[in-house]
């Protein structure tokens, strides 16, 4: 980055070209690119991203850990299979919704699993009823 306080970049845009450009640009450098868009995790790892910041891992960490291990082992077929699983998990709360609607649903899923309470901070509102 060139700035001592910026040590990595997390890209959560749903833009394959953007994460590909970032991951390839910084591959092999000491400036990690982290993928934040779950639908692009598998691709981002192929392109050189060095980590994931997955919302779905808050309630289902296992497929993300398996994906990371598969990617570091070069098992891209397993990565593709895991990407499908992760995308289905992601649909439970995101499914094209804006962040202001998907975050309360994520919290509700986590609350159902006993991981946290369902409350969110303003200006967001707690999820109610079917999504």
Feature locations, PLM:
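Catalytic alpha/beta core domains of metabolic enzymes, predominantly
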Residues: 1-90, 94
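Conserved short secondary-structure transition element at the edge of the structured enzyme core
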Residues: 41, 45-49, 88-122
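Generic structural signal for well-ordered, non-membrane alpha-helical segments
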Residues: 60, 79, 83, 99-103, ...
């Amino acid at each position: 980055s060139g700035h001592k306080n910026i040590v990595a970049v997390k890209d959560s845009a749903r833009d394959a070209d953007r994460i590909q450009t970032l991951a390839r640009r910084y591959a092999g450098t000491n400036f990690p690119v982290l993928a934040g868009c779950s639908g692009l995790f598998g691709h981002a790892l192929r392109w050189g991203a060095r980590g994931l910041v997955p919302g779905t891992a808050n309630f289902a960490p296992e497929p993300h850990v398996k994906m990371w291990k598969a990617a570091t082992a070069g098992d891209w077929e397993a990565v593709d299979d895991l990407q499908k699983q992760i995308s289905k998990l992601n649909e439970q709360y995101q499914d094209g919704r804006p962040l202001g609607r998907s975050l309360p649903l994520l919290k509700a899923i986590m609350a159902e699993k006993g991981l946290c309470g369902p409350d969110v901070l303003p200006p967001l509102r707690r999820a109610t009823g079917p999504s």
